[in-house]
Amino acid sequence: MSKEQILLRINQLKEQLNLWSKQYYVDDNPSVDDTEYDLALKELISLENLYPEFITSDSPSQKVGGTVSEKFLKITHKTPMLSLGNVFNFDEFLEFNTQVSKVSNNLNNEYVAELKIDGLSISLVYENGVLVSAATRGNGVIGEDVTTNVRTIKSIPLKISKKERVEVRGEIYLSKAEFEKINQKRLLNNEDLFINPRNAAAGTLRQLDSKIVASRNLDAFLYYYISDDSPNLNQYESILKLNQLGFKTNKETMLCKNLDQIKAYIDKYTNLKNDLDYQIDGIVFKINDKNLQNSLGFTSKIPKWAIAYKFPAEIKQTKLLDIFATVGRTGKITYNAKLEPVFLMGATISAATLNNAEYIKSKDLRINSIVKIKKAGDVIPEVIEAIKDETFYNLEVFQPILYCPNCHSLLEKNENEVDQFCINSSCSMKILRSLQHFSSREAMNIVSLGDRSLEILFNLEIIQNISDIYKLEEYKDQILAIENFGLKSYLNLIDSINMSKNNSLEKVLFGLGIRHIGSKTAKILARKYQNIDNLMKASYDELIQINSIGESLALSIIDWFKIEDNLKLINELKSFNINFNYLGAKINSDSIIANKTFVITGTLTRPREEFKTLIENNAGKISGSISKQTDYLLAGNNVGSKLEKAKKLGVIIIDEQQFFDLLKSEKG
């Protein structure tokens, strides 16, 4: 065949395969068997391998994965991806509808009812009919670029017929059947099991190797259509438009015309939720009328025209087989329940946290008793009470342990605290948990050094403390000798470790595990002191002057830097060129808004995070509510009750332009 004929055949195969994919994954109505599809795909891949110049991003061959990404870039959402408010029963929904009715003047508002898929939100952007980007929700303003991985999801089209820019939003999920397959495979490979389908889907989408993503058969339901040429589509029209363009939407979606239909929909899926092949944790109700949506507007975090109805927690009975304790990175002892397996909220539950000894005593939980367990949504299962039948009082009363379950050191408990602690600095489990915390995503984000890998390296005594992480190149041969740890894994590990050296101060500060310092406090301290040396010199009196730093936290910081081993660790990390400087924008303490408190409300023309950052960079403070201490209310469009309260309290009210003018002005 000539090149022209090859190109023609490739285009024919692409068109045919895309049609078959839509019929199978979106319409649920396949017209050919798997063998015919596979043969056509094999022919396409063969031709594209011979003529790689003809490979395009919309080719079905690109759904098999293969690109390994070094890291995920960031994408700013053109329209913020907001979260939803919640209601937990029908009476609360009626209250929400009453608020809507104050604007619509109609109690029987039309709502689109959508099952709330327990997955992760995604934003897809198409330009000239081709998928150009896919981003996670992230913080609502900025998400992670997962385009390469999303291309492998068979129910998401790489090409659509519309040429204008289109943004489509939906939920990526893993079916229950696929979840079971993945966990069975992980069990055979002696890998940690995923807790639930949502965690598995999230973990899969963040894989650096898209071949792994392709192998796990993620799926997607799309529900939101944004396009400049169709700004006034009603919500249900938006769903129909998505169907027309070849997107997979949930067939259970319904246009409810009155409250009776809404109640019937809730009752139906409260009973059927566990029979679906995907997990749901509620129902989303959205006002259908686009004009009414616009009139209702938004708060700072949520749309006022949509609400999530969350299913009530499920409660079941099972047997408490055992109570066992674990030790965390700070030495805190956590008690856990081993349960006779029971199916609850779409998952098999065999364990639950019992928090601490005081919690167990307060509920009088006893081994071999029958207990009630509760689970709501993605929340960890909770043991709520013991069934005190005639056999209960013959069971042994629970007694707290006295010694660490790992190193067997005597535990300590302060009078004013409910928790017990292992204070042995050499406790191996404390050390391992500290290492896992240091390398975690929220801290140093050493992507290739997961909990499992760290445990293996720790048990082999290759890593025994934080500084050992930065010496791994000395152990190349030992690491390569580990089963399933090839050269590629080793190189990825070293790259991740080297990248972590460039983190900003707040990441390493959080990673060090100083008691009471969370990620938010770490950032406050990093912004204030700019580098680790300044923080080490800070006095107690100086620390407690900082907003949100209390006495116990200030003492914890002072005490941590008094310990010789901790100072030695800082110096060792410096010798490995770990950055200990704050890399964020420097605070302008001389700004006119320094120490002024702002509240932000309404819809703004720029992302809310941008205004928060500007305020913080100019030494201002952010509050979520109006009070006598509020200096300014920054008000956008569609403001709510905060405006009236600000007027009553005499708070200065400014718009966006006045805010920027204020920043430019000088202190008088």
Curated annotation (Swiss-Prot):
GO molecular function, one term: DNA ligase (NAD+) activity
Binding site for Zn(2+): C404, C407, C422, C427
Entries under Pfam families matching the protein: BRCT (PF00533), DNA_ligase_aden (PF01653), DNA_ligase_OB (PF03120), DNA_ligase_ZBD (PF03119), HHH_2 (PF12826)
Active-site residues, record numbering mapped to chain: K116
Disulfide linkage: none
EC number: 6.5.1.2
Superkingdom, taxonomy of origin: Bacteria
Keywords assigned: DNA damage, DNA repair, DNA replication, Ligase, Magnesium, Manganese, Metal-binding, NAD, Zinc
Alphabetical GO biological process terms: DNA repair; DNA replication
Catalytic activity: NAD(+) + (deoxyribonucleotide)n-3'-hydroxyl + 5'-phospho-(deoxyribonucleotide)m = (deoxyribonucleotide)n+m + AMP + beta-nicotinamide D-nucleotide
Binding residues annotated for NAD(+), in chain numbering: D34, T35, E36, Y37, D38, S83, L84, E114, R137, E171, K286, K310
Chain ranges of the BRCT domain: 588-668
InterPro entries in the cross-refs: BRCT_dom (IPR001357), BRCT_dom_sf (IPR036420), DisA/LigA_HHH (IPR041663), DNA_ligase (IPR001679), DNA_ligase_AS (IPR018239), DNAligase_adenylation (IPR013839), DNAligase_N (IPR013840), NA-bd_OB-fold (IPR012340)
Co-factor requirement: Mg(2+); Mn(2+)
Gene Ontology cellular component terms for the protein in this record: cytosol
Similarity field: Belongs to the NAD-dependent DNA ligase family. LigA subfamily.
Functional summary from the UniProt entry: DNA ligase that catalyzes the formation of phosphodiester linkages between 5'-phosphoryl and 3'-hydroxyl groups in double-stranded DNA using NAD as a coenzyme and as the energy source for the reaction. It is essential for DNA replication and repair of damaged DNA.
Listed PANTHER family: CHROMOSOME TRANSMISSION FIDELITY FACTOR 18, DNA LIGASE
UniProt name for this protein: DNA ligase
Organism: Mycoplasma capricolum subsp. capricolum (strain California kid / ATCC 27343 / NCTC 10154)
Lineage, uppermost ranks: Bacteria, Bacillati, Mycoplasmatota, Mollicutes, Mycoplasmataceae
Gene it is expressed from: ligA
